[in-house]
Amino acid sequence: MGFASASREEKLKMMKTNKTRKTTKNLNRLAKKKKLSREIRDGMSDIKARKSADLRQRAVNIEDDFIADREARYENDDEEDLPLDMMDADIDWENSAFANAKRRLDRKRNGGADSDEDEDEDDVETKKRKFAGQLEEGHEELLPIKLKDGTLIRPTREKEVEEQEEEEKSDIDEGEEDEPHKEDFSHLSASELITKRRELLQEFKDTIASHANMLLANPQVNIVRLRDLYNLCNGEKVHSLVREPVQKLAMASTLQVLLDIVPGYAIREQTAEEKSQKQKKETRNLVNFEESLLRYHLKYLQLCEKLSNKLVGKDRHNDENTFTFKMGILSVKALARIVISAPHFNYSTNIISSLVRLSLAKNETVVKEVCDAIRTVFKELHLKITLFTSRSISTLVTKRKGRVSPELLKTLLSMNITEVANEDKKSGKDALIAKKYQIKKERASKTAKKYKKQLARLEADLLEVEAEESLTKKMKHATEAMKFAFQTYFSVLKRMPSSALLEPVLEGLSKFAHLLSIEFYEDIVSTMENMVQNENLKPLDQLHCINTVFVILSGDGQLLNIDPSKFYRLAYRVLNHFPFEKRPEQRKNQIVMAAKTLETMLVTRRKAVPLSRVAAFVKRLLSIATVLDDFPALCIVSLVRSLFIAHPKLSSMIEDEEGGAPGVFRQDIDDPDVANALASDVRDELSMLARRRNVELSRFANNILYGVPSTGIFKLNPQLSSLKPWILMGQLTDNAKEAYDRVETKYLDELEKTAKKRNQTVTPKNINFHISNWLTVAK
């Protein structure tokens, strides 16, 4: 019915409706532009609320009427329950629809005769009811066509079978298709079998490459290919002839694809409320991609964990040539790559837990791969992952009561943490925010220029405080990580299950002693004192104990009432053991640790050390350096040079005139305070070292011998002389043409030959006496 043919009442109603619609539209447009007053906006809200209330009430009334009608029907139902025997008799199973449907399904599976011939009229029960206007199953409606006479035709067509099936229904009945792994090649000869294997392997290589390229080209569209790669990782639908190489290729390819397509953020699972909301097509596609990626990422990690766990267990000494071991070690490497390359992504903490647990493996290759990955995580300064890793190691050590690999504890040394949070310092952000609101409140009483200036200054202060808070958060993670590291160290020291664990523990305490809380200082110093007096403790471990004590005493622990003289005596005595260490790596570690410790003892604390004590260390250090090979000797000579600079009065030890202290130097006494080293000189030792073939060692020795000049022919290259002794040795060792893989003992051999002529042997207790005689003979 049109407007012209309508009655007067209907015309008025239509005009009113159009006018209302236009008014509402104008009001909404003005509201968006914020040009309406508050009263008008409140009035519009009230009108909308009344309309929605009426609609809700109508829906409630309809629901109440429906419930009342159902209850009335149940009350009027006079049908009584039948006895059990009548119920049994009423069921004719053989002629029921369920039996007919089952028979048809069985015939279809067994390839029987056409089932249409045996269909009964009773099968109507199993068919879906079809209503008018409802499409048949498997059909879809196309765009309608309007003819000239106004008739609408709604064409339909059969749905195209989608190539992408539901991901969760990927398991297909084995009998429906001929799977490649069921093909029988037993009739082939050896050469034909090799050719067939090569063809199959190339076919799967092409398949893997195709899936990977599609994923990298468009991850959101082709994410289903990740499922196919995962199935190949499991060896599904792969012939046993090529299953092993295909699985390894698929594992490596899936790993690289995952690393390339994971986003730079952690995917958050949507809540039920978010899933029920209407979303844009782009948003929905992104959500589907993230869900699929996360699902198959988790499945891949679970597969890696399952394969790698086969390497761990009691009496698990795996043969490295077996397929199980190869897949296990490949899985370990995959887990390590993921956590190193994407520490921000989901399940990183789960990977860390798995790697820490894998460190219990008996195989050294597995332990090395795991520990290398953990070291890399520590070095990358991802403090959240560092904190979780430190906590996982601490938990494992406590749970296993210290029965873990020393390599696992050595990984803690790779933590790049040099500072921890100061809990006493508080942020002033709350005060600044309060001040900001106060300034805004007082805006009316200020000029615009003054208000803007104050607000800008306050905003700058807030940005600075927020940056400090971000740094404070990182410091908090670092503090927590160090807390768990110290907890691990104290747990091992408390139990001391094996001496193999002492070295990484003492080295860790030595490195991070400056980060210890002050309340632990006295306990640590007491523990180190008891341990260092153990004669069975290795020289390197003794140096770690001594260094830990002096790092504490050089910082906040200098106020402690502790006499360090006993630690000076212990350090003085341990120097005699260096020439007898034949392992190059161990000797290098000893020299580096000794240089660091002695610099703290004699240079950092130079105001608290008497000159006679420093002179005794100089004499013994140069004496020991004469029988060491070139690089360790250079490190010691560089350290002695820094002692001559820090203590200028040591110049009396290199002067020709007799002006030293009275008395005789007692080289047989292991107490630097009573050895009277100022009564001796070091010219013979320096002259011997200056004759070495190593150019840098000779230059350093001559520089000390001639009074540490900064100019002239005996000056040193500033780029080398400014380096720390252990850094200098490391650089020259790395730049050497031949690797430092063996200890040169020719100087010690000459010393032993000289002692043998007197029917004596060289030991740590008498080595200084024999060196003195040897230098006198060689002069």
UniProtKB/Swiss-Prot annotation:
Segments for region (Disordered): 1-20, 100-189
Gene Ontology biological-process annotations: DNA replication initiation
Pfam families: CBF, NOC3p
Main localization of the protein described in the UniProt heading: nucleus
InterPro entries: ARM-type_fold, CCAAT-binding_factor, Noc3_N, Nucleolar_cplx-assoc_3
Keyword Chaperone listed: no
Cited SUPFAM superfamilies: ARM repeat (SSF48371)
GO molecular function, one term: chromatin binding
Residues that span the membrane, as ranges: none
Basic and acidic residues compositional bias, start-end: 136-160
Keywords: Coiled coil, Nucleus
Family (UniProt): Belongs to the CBF/MAK21 family.
Protein name: Nucleolar complex protein 3 homolog
UniProt source species: Caenorhabditis briggsae
